[in-house]
Amino acid sequence: MPPSLPSRTEAGTLVAVTLAVVGAWRPWVRKIPVRTADGSLVSTSELVQGLRAGIHGLDMFVVFGALVAVLGTLIARRYDVSPAPFLVAASVLILWAASTMLAEYRSVERYEPELGVYLTLAGGLVLLVLGVARGVKVAVRRRRGERTGPAT
C-alpha cells in the first residue's frame, strides 16, 4: 500500500521545525557599538551567547525540541495516536530557550536581537498552536465517540 500524504499537522510540524532549527543556526543577537567621548565607535569584547551562527549553548534545547516534535509525529503516525503531547512538549523547550535569551538581550541596551531568535520563537509558537489544536480536536472527537487517530 503506498504511503499516505502528510496531514496538515505533519506538514505544519515540518514547517515549524524548519523555522526553529534555521533560527537556532542563525545569530540571535548583535552588539550595538558604543560611542566614546572622542566620537569613535567601540564594540565591547565580551562573548554573548547567540552572537555567532551555528548550534551552541541553548540552541541544543531547540534542536532537542525539534527532534521531539519530529519523532513524536512519526510515532503518532505509526501507532495511530495523537501527536499533541509531543508537539506541546517540543514547543515548551523551544519557547523557553528562545524567550529566555530574548529577555536577556532586551535587558541590555548594547544588544539587539537578530532574526534567528525571532524565527526560533515563531517555530515554537507554531508547534504550540499545532499541539493545542490537535489536542482540542482529539478531545472533541472523544467526547462525540468518534475515531481520534492522526489520520482523521
Give short role names for the model-derived ranges.
Residues 1-152:
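Compact integral membrane and secretory-pathway proteins
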